[in-house]
């Protein structure tokens, strides 16, 4: 058995019938059901404890064998119809519906809609979408309701012109985050500046910014929430460092061949100290004078799902172009070197390099990749998703085909989605999942 959560449409129907009978008995004393405003029948309702009836016990007695999930298991693999330049939306939907903990949240009916007009709730529509994609229906799904709600809540994405998949991802997470209020009732967020909805629990990380005064070495620290990390590429207008010569080793599928830039290289650049220069002097809170300073970004808190965005589309005063530089990325990623606790520090004036000991809590596994083919003016989005633990599939709108790991790692890469291998057991947080579960 794969030890994953199971969604069974027959059991779901039995649960609805039992729940209906229970509600009739509780109608005079309970007000719980009347508070539910979700427009989808059976969605977001609180099920009572299932007590088996005599016929059900007889059926269970006649069917004692457990079902074993076959390697050809295809539930969840369903194409999406392109409604007119909507590949940017389809590829993100495939990545989100194959995000393990988000999938389990929606398929377990955890959403409690509190919007005055539930038909405008994007979370309700995503719940319906998850149910459609995991229904076992092999025919492509038409996500017209989702597109309509996106146009309503993110008007800058309205219309049939080409859009950016990364921009859609951030807009979708923002709307889902706003519509999730009510799902975290009674829970206390670990950070008072954040809510504790499923979007924050899965996607929100903490980005630490340290500004160091060059005169007194005083440090000003701020921590901001983030849903993704955008990374500069070689060949862009921003400066990039040359590759270190002689690095020819390979780690978990990430190439280190001279001349090839890796995801790790991009993360090193993202977290290296940056001199702000004389034109950007700031008033130091320690010495109370305007001084030059350095700025360094590191991760204070890692999200459950880490999304990396390569800045392939460059818009400057001189030109608009797409950067096609190949970036090697691994199947497994260790974020320990890029944590605030691992950054370079000075002790008695001497630079101390971090000791990057293995930390399983900071290790991630790749589960989705979004790619863009074509030019800045005319292109097409597709995605690779991991399914049934170690199988990969290419999602090209309505067409889904089997893919190899080599196909995935050789792809250009625009958005990379990594899932934590080990989840820290925290109260009222998302359930712990073993790596085998996704």
From Swiss-Prot:
Keyword Transmembrane helix among record annotations: no
Q: Which Pfam families match?
A: UCH
What InterPro entries would the database entry show? Papain-like_cys_pep_sf, Peptidase_C19_UCH, Ub_carboxyl-term_hydrolase, USP_CS, USP_dom
Name of the protein in question? Ubiquitin carboxyl-terminal hydrolase 27
Q: Where in the cell is it found?
A: Cytoplasm, Cytosol; Nucleus
Q: What does this protein do?
A: Deubiquitinase involved in innate antiviral immunity by mediating deubiquitination of CGAS and RIGI. Negatively regulates RIGI by mediating 'Lys-63'-linked deubiquitination of RIGI, inhibiting type I interferon signaling. Also regulates 'Lys-63'-linked ubiquitination level of MDA5/IFIH1. Acts as a positive regulator of the cGAS-STING pathway by catalyzing 'Lys-48'-linked deubiquitination of CGAS, thereby promoting its stabilization. Can reduce the levels of BCL2L11/BIM ubiquitination and stabilize BCL2L11 in response to the RAF-MAPK-degradation signal.
- Please give the Gene Ontology molecular function terms for this protein: cysteine-type deubiquitinase activity; cysteine-type endopeptidase activity; K48-linked deubiquitinase activity; K63-linked deubiquitinase activity
Keywords, alphabetical: Cytoplasm, Hydrolase, Immunity, Innate immunity, Nucleus, Protease, Thiol protease, Ubl conjugation pathway
- The active-site annotation reads 87, 380
Tell me, how does this one assemble?
A: Interacts with phosphorylated BCL2L11 isoform BIMEL; this interaction leads to BCL2L11 deubiquitination and stabilization.
Q: Read off the PANTHER family from this record.
A: UBIQUITIN CARBOXYL-TERMINAL HYDROLASE, UBIQUITIN CARBOXYL-TERMINAL HYDROLASE 27
| Domain USP per the UniProt entry, residue ranges | 78-421
Give the EC number(s) listed in the UniProt record: 3.4.19.12
Q: Name one GO biological process term.
A: proteolysis
- Record's keyword annotation contains Nucleus: yes
Cited Gene3D superfamilies: Cysteine proteinases
* Originating organism: Mus musculus (Mouse)
What reaction(s) does this enzyme catalyze? Answer: Thiol-dependent hydrolysis of ester, thioester, amide, peptide and isopeptide bonds formed by the C-terminal Gly of ubiquitin (a 76-residue protein attached to proteins as an intracellular targeting signal)
List, alphabetically, the GO terms of the cellular component aspect: cytosol; nucleus
Entry similarity comment? Belongs to the peptidase C19 family.
